[in-house]
Amino acid sequence: MAKLILIIVTQILLIAAVVSARKGENFAKTIDKKHFGLRKEKLTHFRVYWHDILSGSNPSSVVINPPISNSSFFGSVTVIDNRLTTEVAVNSTLVGQAQGIYAATGQRDASALMVMNFAFKTGKYNGSSIAILGRNAVLTKVREMPVIGGSGLFRFARGYVEARTMWFDQKSGDATVEYSCYVLHY
C-alpha cells in the first residue's frame, strides 16, 4: 500500500511540474516592431567633446576609490558628470552630460573600464541618451568602445564610439576627449 501511495504522489508531482513548466513558456512572445512605432533603422554620426575635470572647486569627476599603489592607477574608481560640448573649449556650447563611472583596470597598462551614458540636453535629441560600456586603452591614439543601448530617440541603439584625447594636464589629471559616435537606431 505504501508503494502505491508513493507511486501516485510521484505521478501527481510529475504532472504538476509539467503543467507548471508549460505556463512558464508564456512569459515572452515575439511582437512586431511596428507596435513600437519603429520605422527604418538609420545611422547617426555626431561628435562631442568630453571634459573630465578633476581639479578646482567644482570638479565634474571625483575619485571615490583611490588606486591601490602609487606606481599605477589600478583599482581607482571615478564617478563622472562631465560636460559634453560641440567644441574643444570647455565653455563651448553644452549639448549634454556624460554620467557614469570609469575604473582603472590595467595593472600593467593604462586602461579603464568605461561605463557611462551620454545624456543629451538640447535640440532634437533632448532627453535621449546612449549607453557606452567598454575598455578604454587610454594611451592609444584612437580608442574604440561599444554603444550598447539608448533611450528616447536612441531606443534600441547599437554602435561604437571612437575616443581621441585632445588635451591632457598631467598635473591635475584634467582632460578633453573627442568622442566620434556612430549609432544605429530607429
UniProtKB/Swiss-Prot annotation:
Localization per Swiss-Prot or TrEMBL: Secreted, Extracellular space, Apoplast
Keywords linked to the UniProt accession: Apoplast, Glycoprotein, Secreted, Signal
Primary localization: secreted
Signal sequence annotation: 1-21
Record-annotated disulphide pairs: none
Gene Ontology annotations of biological process type: phenylpropanoid biosynthetic process
Record's GO cellular component terms: apoplast
Keyword Iron: no
Oligomer status and interactors: Homodimer.
Listed PANTHER family: NUCLEOPORIN-RELATED
Similarity comment: family membership: Belongs to the plant dirigent protein family.
UniProt function note: Dirigent proteins impart stereoselectivity on the phenoxy radical-coupling reaction, yielding optically active lignans from two molecules of coniferyl alcohol in the biosynthesis of lignans, flavonolignans, and alkaloids and thus plays a central role in plant secondary metabolism.
The protein, known as: Dirigent protein 7
Species per Swiss-Prot/TrEMBL record: Arabidopsis thaliana (Mouse-ear cress)
Lineage: Eukaryota, Viridiplantae, Streptophyta, Embryophyta, Tracheophyta
Protein encoded by which gene: DIR7
